Amino acid sequence: MLGRHPKALRRLGILFAGGRVEKVYWAVVEGRPPEAKGRIETGLKKLTRGTGWHMVVDPVGQKAITDYRVCGLGDGRAWLELRPRTGRTHQLRVHCAAIGCPVVGDAVYGNPASGESLQLYARSITLPLYPARAPLEITAPVPPHMRAALQRLGHHEVVAS
């Protein structure tokens, strides 16, 4: 997200830091969450080993909260709408894995042998830029690598050619 001038950048920074920016992600995950909608609330901690690192669920780690909603089911997979309430590194991927539904194509927190592309993307962002105006909502189209999977789960989006 870019601002045209320092004042705009400061305002955007305040919105993000204050949790006033609404972010929505879509994911195709393995399995089915325990409920049609819910909240995942865990601590997350960075674990460094050998040549790499990854995040793990840890009760004394940084607080991380994600709300989810199931949008479609089929073929042993689910289409989830994810709304992070905090902004931790790899939060959505770790949270999906923590409820037994790793993101399809996630070689770190899911099945490294699947060979599929990561099925997670930022669907929309809503910015309350001005108090007297409606928030600005920006929605991204479904990326090409996710279209077929989402269609199998019930999503139908007209794609401009």
Model segments located where?
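RNA pseudouridine synthases
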Residues: 2-161
